[in-house]
Amino acid sequence: MIDETLFDAEEKMEKAVSVARDELGSIRTGRANPGMFNRINIDYYGSMTPITQLASINVPEARLVVIKPYEASQLRAIEDAIRNSDLGVNPSNDGNIIRVAIPQLTEERRRELVKQAKSKGEDAKVSVRNIRRKAMEELSRIKKDGEAGEDEVSRAEKDLDKSTHTYTAQIDELVKHKESELLEV
């Protein structure tokens, strides 16, 4: 029972770090990156579909993204979705492909994006801490019900604390990396 609780908590913490990695990856840095379009969804015959399933996304130059829809009929919808997203870019299409020029980030915008990255990192750390809290509650229930001895539960709590520290450190590292990426001119 203790092992299941620890395994479950580890799995959820891993998922929280993965979500943080994806969220931080979607923050624009001033360089072209296909990952910045991951959160954009397009209405495709009545269902919201990720842009990555409707078009190929390539980066031929450091500041240019080329998006080629698999269906020409989706060109306008993809262009509108990119324009209406929070990326701050202006796509242009030539009838076959969409070109997205990535503008230089201003100092003010960089600072804004750093704040956004820190906020997403903090949200992920809160998520990890909530997972830890729930696992600790489960461990104390196990101890109270007599399903395991005090020593076993104490050892499990230490392991849980170690895992929590490891995953929050990973999140801090991701945020630090993103921050340096954003502030790099």
UniProtKB/Swiss-Prot annotation:
The gene is frr. The keyword Protein biosynthesis applies. GO terms for biological process: translational termination. It is found in: Cytoplasm. It holds the Pfam family RRF. Disulfide bonds: none annotated. GO terms for cellular component: cytoplasm. It comes from Mycolicibacterium smegmatis (strain ATCC 700084 / mc(2)155). Residues 142-164 are annotated as: Disordered. This is Ribosome-recycling factor. Keywords: Cytoplasm, Protein biosynthesis. Belongs to the RRF family. Responsible for the release of ribosomes from messenger RNA at the termination of protein biosynthesis. May increase the efficiency of translation by recycling ribosomes from one round of translation to another. The keyword Transmembrane helix does not apply.
